[in-house]
Amino acid sequence: LRVFVMGDRAVNREPATEDDIEAMKVLLKEGVEAGAVGFSTSRTLVHRSADGNLVPTYKAATRELKSLGESLSGQKGHVFQLISDWEDPQDEFSILKEVSEKTGAKGTFTLLHLDNEPDLWEEQLSMVESAQSEGLDIRGQVLSRPVGMMMGIPSSMNPFYRRPSYMALDDLPWETRLERLKDPETKSAIL
């Protein structure tokens, strides 16, 4: 969403403006209404582009993520996922908690044991237990096995690559394919 709305400003990890955030919220809501499970974002050094650059969402502002989470409001059973290095555990968890409180979305994050923060997982689980005692559905997920592939629309592997309606776009030039993917009928056929 960030790159789609902000272009190079997102790639350079510039702060999103209020207009950027509003545009991302519209697209996120459209995606959820079209069948997306929810919203996932990454603020970890581990996630990088193919050329080694940090992902555009690294260090995205807390207010940006909380605001985007509002797009899940009224969307029953949807998920807000945060992948983080947990530099500030209270701030990171506040994103999940606030989105869940305001929208009813399920919150999830990757729960890892980190050598440089050996007790972090216990703090995270304590925050989860506290949130669950307040009636929120927030869970840590243990990463059982790292995925070793790059997935995305311009890649050879993405969630739609085996759908005939998506395969029909394979031979189109990239810009043409993007235009077709914006078409509501094409989106509907793929989904």
List where the protein language model places each region.
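Catalytic pocket of metal/acid-base enzymes, prominently hydrolases
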Residues: L1-L82
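Polyanionic/metal-chelating signatures
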Residues: R9-D19, M24-L27, G31-V32, L54, ...
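Short, solvent-exposed turn/loop segments enriched in Gly/Ser/Thr/Pro and often Arg
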Residues: S42-L45, D85-D88, S144
